[in-house]
C-alpha cells in the first residue's frame, strides 16, 4: 500500500508520496526516474531549465522546473514536485536527475532523450559567449502547437 514503510528500504514511502503527488497533477500514467550523467548535471544547476532546443520545449515543457526533494523531509517537497509537473512532461529533481512523465513508456523515454540533448546543449551554452535559450514567447508557442498536434494524433490511435 502506498505510504507504508518497506523493510530495508526507508526511501520507498517517500518515493511513493512523490509519485502520488505527480499523478494528482498530470493526466499521464508513467513516471520514470533518470539518473544519467546529463540529467544529474542539469538538475545540479538548481534552477528551472529554459529550453535551448526546440524539441525539448515541445516535448518536455517550455520551462522545466527544478525542485528540491529530500527523502527525509516532510511532505512539502512532494507537493511542490507534483505542482511543478503540471503542464510538463519532465521535472528536474535537484541533485537527483530527472523525472520524465508520459502516457506510456515510449513517451517517457522520448522525454529522456530530449532532456539529455538539452543538458548537453546547456553545457555547451555555458562555454560559448552570447548563447541564449529560446525566448519565452517562442517556447510557449512551440509547446502549445506541439501539445495540440500531438493530442489530436494520440486521440486517433
Located regions from the model:
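Glycine-rich flexible loops
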Residues: 1-157
Amino acid at each position: 500500500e502506498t505510504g507504508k514503510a518497506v523493510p530495508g528500504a526507508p526511501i520507498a514511502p517517500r518515493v511513493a508520496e512523490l509519485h502520488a503527488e505527480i499523478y494528482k497533477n498530470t493526466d499521464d500514467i508513467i513516471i520514470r526516474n533518470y539518473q544519467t550523467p546529463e540529467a544529474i548535471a542539469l538538475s545540479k544547476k538548481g534552477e528551472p531549465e529554459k529550453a535551448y532546443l526546440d524539441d525539448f520545449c515541445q516535448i518536455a515543457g517550455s520551462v522545466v522546473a527544478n525542485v528540491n526533494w529530500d527523502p527525509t523531509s516532510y511532505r512539502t517537497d512532494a507537493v511542490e514536485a507534483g505542482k511543478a509537473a503540471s503542464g510538463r512532461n519532465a521535472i528536474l529533481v535537484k541533485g537527483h536527475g530527472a523525472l520524465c512523465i508520459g502516457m506510456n513508456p515510449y513517451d517517457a523515454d522520448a522525454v529522456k532523450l530530449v532532456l539529455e540533448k538539452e543538458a548537453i546543449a546547456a553545457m555547451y551554452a555555458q562555454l560559448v559567449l552570447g548563447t541564449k535559450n529560446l525566448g519565452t514567447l517562442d517556447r510557449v508557442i512551440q509547446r502549445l502547437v506541439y501539445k495540440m498536434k500531438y493530442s489530436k494524433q494520440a486521440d486517433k490511435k
